[in-house]
Amino acid sequence: MAHVATEYVCFIDSDIVVEHGTLTRLRREFLDPAVAVAGPRILGLPLSPAAGSVAHYEAARSSLDLGSGPGRVAPATRVSYLPSAVLMARVAALGGGFDETMHVAEDVDLVWRVVAGGWSVRYVPQCSVRHDHRVEAMAWLERKAFYGTGADQLARRHGDLVAPLRLDPLCATAVGALVAQRRWSVPVAVIAAGAHLGLMAARAPSPQQRLATGANLTAMTLVATGWQFAGAATRHHWPLAAIAALVSRRARRGIVVAALAEGIADYRRVRPDLDPATYLLLHRADDLAYGLGVWAGALRGRSIRALLPVWTRPWRRGQASPTKTPQKEKTHGTQVV
């Protein structure tokens, strides 16, 4: 990039096949002077008849494929990063460009720095490229773990933006009580959920709609919190879940339910060309490898910041809104690439 003399630059990895019209379509985004970076959808190469299960899984669930929905890119949103496999950018907005000390997650870091600088970053799935995915089992698992190691570096540079969980304290208490499966679980959950409903209802703009608004927001936040708990137990925090499962029958039961429920829901959303059992096994292996990478990065960096949740404060927010999980559109929390 230091040698680029043009107004725009496009980074393209050597294992990418650019489809016709993609670069022209990306260039169109920069007619908006606020746009600094734009990226296309990254799909796999067409599958051969001999393609194995991992190839079919990656075709449906690659970490590089951010889905069919266009959108603004920013931390803790539906599209929280863009892979640097293909990026078009306005040179003046990039500053020093990629941090060359980072060998993983450098693309996430660049996008987040650009967004923090006040620029707009866009995901443009209307155009696409093809990527030569890793489809050998060990190479695939190693790459997933490698992605996970970047969480520690991002946490050092961007703090809570990389947090794997964003939790409302009251709803987290309610869901946590139910997960504990004790005699006091239901009363505690009811009290915590009722307190959240009261807070949301008190801030509804219309007195006539307070109860309905509060109930709707509380229900949405409880569901989102439950999915975050399931994702944490099977992805970022699975080592802790595994330890709990060794000593507690309730924990084992809860982890099995979480692993099955999250996997089945993901299968229904992705609709892969795989049978449910094979997809579920590969999905769990994907999460285990990524989580192992996150913990390896944390141990290497001697910091658990990338594993800590962020606690929201609903009583201090300007508007009542449900707690949302940033991935698993692709992943729970931020999927580091």
Name each model-derived stretch.
Residues M1-V4, P70-A74, R113:
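Glycine-rich, basic loop-to-helix element that forms the pyrophosphate-binding segment
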Residues V9:
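Short aromatic/hydrophobic "clamp" motif used to bind/position activated sugar donors
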Residues D13-V17:
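The conserved acidic donor/metal-binding loop of glycosyltransferases
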Residues G21-V54, D132:
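Conserved donor NDP-sugar-binding/catalytic core segment of glycosyltransferases
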Residues P40, H56-V79:
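Short, flexible, basic/aromatic active-site loop/helix in glycosyltransferases
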Residues P83-L87, A93-G97, T101-C127:
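A short, conserved alpha-helix in the catalytic core of glycosyltransferases
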Residues V124-P125, R130-V188, L199-A296, R302, ...:
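Active-site-adjacent helix/loop segment of glycosyltransferases
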Residues L307-V337:
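Actinobacteria-biased recognition of intrinsically disordered, low-complexity terminal regions
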